[in-house]
From Swiss-Prot:
It comes from the Bacteria. Belongs to the P-Pant transferase superfamily. AcpS family. This is Holo-[acyl-carrier-protein] synthase. Its cofactor is Mg(2+). The lineage of its organism: Bacteria, Bacillati, Bacillota, Bacilli, Bacillales.
Length: 118
């Protein structure tokens, strides 16, 4: 059963100025996300990744009904499985989708109770 749905959208240009700001990156990205972020060479890819992860965290907090006020960005870690599918670390009941264009990143998160309804 669906317990909550959250979505977020962000202009990538709003985060590009922060891709070299260690203080901002440390506040937003979980260490596991930061490790992946640091592998990217291009500013464009770094900005896409940062905007996407920011959107996931906002969408996840909305889906839980808490907002970021009850969770910190560090409490939420979005990784990718071997096929590239994004997931929230330590929450198998969260289902994540991230997309971006050249200018916009968006994320959609559904949180379920773990029961499958056919």
């Amino acid at each position: 059963m669906i317990m909550g749905i959250g979505t977020d959208i962000l202009e990538i240009s709003r985060v590009i100025q922060y891709i070299d700001d260690n203080k901002f990156l440390t506040r937003i990205l979980h260490p596991d996300e930061r490790e992946r972020f640091d592998t990217f060479q291009s500013e464009k890819r770094k900005a896409e990744y940062l905007a996407g992860r920011f959107c996931v965290k906002e969408a996840y907090a909305k889906a839980l009904g808490t907002g970021i006020g009850k969770l910190s960005f560090q409490d939420i870690c979005c990784l990718n499985d071997v096929s590239g599918k994004p997931y929230i670390k330590d929450d198998t009941n969260a289902h994540v989708s991230i997309a971006h264009t050249d200018t916009i990143a968006t994320a959609y998160v559904i949180v379920t109770d773990g029961n499958v309804i056919l």
